């Protein structure tokens, strides 16, 4: 008896699609979940509340120091803000006796508004009406954090309309000022007399409150305000990138535009800004829209469909899944599907497609009796199996309708041309009319300068390309002889936005990370998989443009999750690769019910390429892996930041993500 085989069997489970998967250790599951969470938002397979509960449960299964290290890693390396605070709150609820929590809080809180965010998170997770029972370690950590910020930072994030304000936090944690100047600053917070900060929001708000005789006059005033902000040098990198469309629509002058381009493409400014790569893609997508729905319109469209047609489909989908789970209880899906294919009206036993049925021609009654006996042994009736078959057909129909629905609500900038029938369906005629008026004014201003929108926007697009290229500089360990395959998942679950405010979806992130890798590799094959695998070839120079081109091919390979098709293609072509990288949410299954699986295909491929390594880039963090992580040739990497490539380099040196996190000194 092989005990190793028994241990491997104990790791087996099923993913959300019902396919074979492997459990992760609590540390790995917590890591993959945390670095793929931006807030309490619903994922495709998991609600936001369920994910928070899962994180809270995992915090209690791992050692406290690792949780503190992971919170710091998520904040400093992955550039996440909300989920590190959740980790610290859950850690404070179950760990006491030392200063670990306070030290982690002091280091994790890096923006003034995170002080109040952490307190609101604690109040939410404690289900209390007030903060009177706040953990002493959280108090000490927040008291230290108060001393890290100046008046500008406090004034910028002093929001009086929040449930917990900076004044409330100050009265609660009682920080000790370092000197008289800081004591005066704390008094200003208490009295509400902080100086109004010089920010782009306050300047534009002041300009917008003036009275104008026409829309053109208003645009001129706002344009002048933007130009002053740019020349002042006090416009932040993120604010500049978020408002490129506004600057374009207002047609800022050439001098200001050149300053914006220089700032965006400056490698040092990119490094200090600590922007996630998909932020550059989001700005690039917005600039490439031309007389088409802008991201706000697309978000409104998506909400409409999800709240109406999409919600009805989802409710029916989950109800069918619930019924199928009840029927399948104790019976494997693959066997159930085989029984469903048995035709009642025929006497050919081999058509039954049922294991154990003898080959040959037998009376129908005899065949039915044998199958009925087998089903009874498994705890199912023939009626149950027929019902299961009917439900599966309904489920497949809903999946097709959901795929079509996602086509309408996904952010495909190159395909929103033509009549825009969905505008009338959604009822945003007034919005479209106002946008058209804004675009008409923009075109008029450009015409006066003898420019087209393409000529005006091209330098900004090039600046964004330069910026994102600098984020690829930390990708190490690849030379011209390294053979790499990059595969991106296009399944329906990848069309979920990373957050409610974002126009970027998981599908975009997978493509962008693959294009970043392509930029650094010379011997590379890129492609997408859904129902099948298809390769696409683009020049390696442009990252964002190539991502846009890949987005335009969405739907050509279908919306299934047949990740095994990537490896099967390598087997059929007998292509030897050094590294195979799959960017996915790890919810893979065989939509053809043919018994294929990524793990099985990889084992076969290893006979052709014994030295090949498989890298799974987990973009959603559902807690399972389609291949056993105990294999020495399979690696799991999670997250959306370019810092994931540091983990890739660490793997070459015998380390992994958990080892990197454990090296952090709290």
Indicate where each model-derived feature is located.
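Long lumenal/extracellular ectodomains of secretory and single-pass membrane proteins
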Residues: 1-504, 519-666
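Short basic/aromatic active-site micro-motif
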Residues: 507
């Amino acid at each position: 008896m092989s005990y190793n085989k028994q241990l491997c069997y104990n790791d087996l489970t099923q993913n959300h699609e019902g396919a074979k998967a492997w459990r992760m250790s609590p540390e790995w599951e917590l890591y993959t979940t945390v670095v793929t969470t931006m807030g309490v938002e619903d994922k495709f397979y998991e609600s936001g509340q369920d994910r928070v509960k899962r994180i809270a449960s995992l915090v209690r299964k791992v050692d406290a120091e690792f949780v503190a290290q992971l919170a710091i890693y998520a904040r400093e390396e992955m550039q996440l803000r909300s989920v590190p605070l959740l980790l610290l709150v859950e850690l404070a609820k179950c760990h006491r006796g030392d200063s670990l929590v306070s030290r982690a809080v002091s280091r994790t809180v890096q923006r003034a508004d995170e002080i109040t965010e952490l307190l609101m998170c604690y109040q939410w997770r404690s289900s209390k009406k007030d903060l009177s029972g706040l953990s002493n370690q959280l108090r000490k950590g927040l008291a230290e954090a108060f001393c890290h910020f100046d008046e500008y930072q406090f004034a910028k994030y002093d929001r009086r309309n929040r449930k917990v304000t900076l004044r409330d936090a100050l009265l609660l944690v009682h920080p000790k000022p370092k000197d008289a100047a800081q004591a005066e600053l704390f008094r200003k917070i208490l009295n509400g007399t902080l100086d109004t900060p010089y920010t782009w929001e306050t300047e534009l708000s002041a300009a917008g409150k003036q009275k104008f005789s026409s829309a053109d006059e208003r645009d001129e005033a706002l344009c002048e305000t933007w130009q002053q902000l740019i020349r002042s040098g006090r416009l932040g990198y993120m604010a500049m990138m978020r408002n490129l469309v506004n600057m374009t629509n207002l047609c800022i002058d050439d001098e200001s535009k050149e300053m914006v381009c220089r700032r965006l493409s400056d490698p040092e400014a990119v490094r200090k800004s600590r922007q996630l790569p998909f932020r550059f893609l989001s700005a690039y997508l917005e600039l490439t829209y031309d007389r088409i729905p802008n991201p706000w319109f697309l978000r409104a469209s998506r909400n409409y469909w999800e709240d109406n047609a999409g919600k009805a489909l989802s409710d029916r989908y989950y109800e069918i899944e619930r019924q199928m789970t009840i029927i399948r209880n104790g019976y494997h899906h693959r066997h159930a599907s085989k029984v469903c294919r048995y035709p009642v009206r025929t006497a050919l036993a081999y058509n039954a497609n049922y294991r154990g049925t003898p080959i040959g021609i037998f009376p129908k009654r005899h065949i039915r009796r044998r199958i009925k006996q087998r089903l009874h042994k498994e705890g199912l009736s023939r009626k149950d199996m027929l019902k299961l078959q009917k439900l599966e057909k309904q489920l497949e129909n809903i999946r097709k309708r959901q795929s079509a629905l996602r086509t309408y609500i996904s952010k495909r900038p190159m395909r929103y041309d033509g009549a825009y029938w969905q505008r009338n369906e959604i009822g945003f005629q007034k919005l479209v009319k106002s946008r058209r008026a804004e675009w008409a004014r923009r075109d008029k201003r450009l015409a006066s300068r003898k420019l087209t929108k393409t000529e005006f926007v091209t330098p900004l697009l090039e600046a964004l390309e330069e910026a994102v290229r600098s984020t690829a500089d930390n990708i190490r360990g690849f030379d011209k002889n390294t053979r790499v395959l990059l595969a991106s998942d296009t399944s329906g679950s990848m069309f979920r936005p990373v957050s409610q405010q974002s126009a970027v979806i998981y599908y975009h992130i997978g493509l962008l990370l693959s294009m970043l890798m392509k930029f650094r590799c010379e011997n590379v094959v890129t492609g997408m998989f859904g129902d099948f695998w298809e390769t696409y070839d683009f020049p390696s120079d442009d990252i964002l443009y190539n991502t846009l081109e890949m987005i335009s091919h969405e739907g050509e390979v279908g919306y299934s999750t047949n990740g095994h098709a990537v490896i099967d293609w390598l087997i059929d072509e007998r292509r030897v690769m050094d590294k195979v990288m799959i960017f996915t949410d790890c919810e893979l299954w065989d939509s053809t019910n043919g018994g294929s699986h990524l793990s099985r295909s990889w084992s076969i491929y290893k006979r052709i390429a014994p030295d090949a390594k498989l890298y799974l880039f987990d973009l959603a963090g559902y807690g399972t892996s389609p291949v056993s992580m105990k294999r020495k040739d399979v690696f799991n990497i999670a997250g959306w930041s370019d810092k994931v490539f540091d983990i890739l380099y660490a793997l070459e040196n015998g380390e992994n993500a958990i080892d990197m996190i454990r090296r952090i000194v709290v």
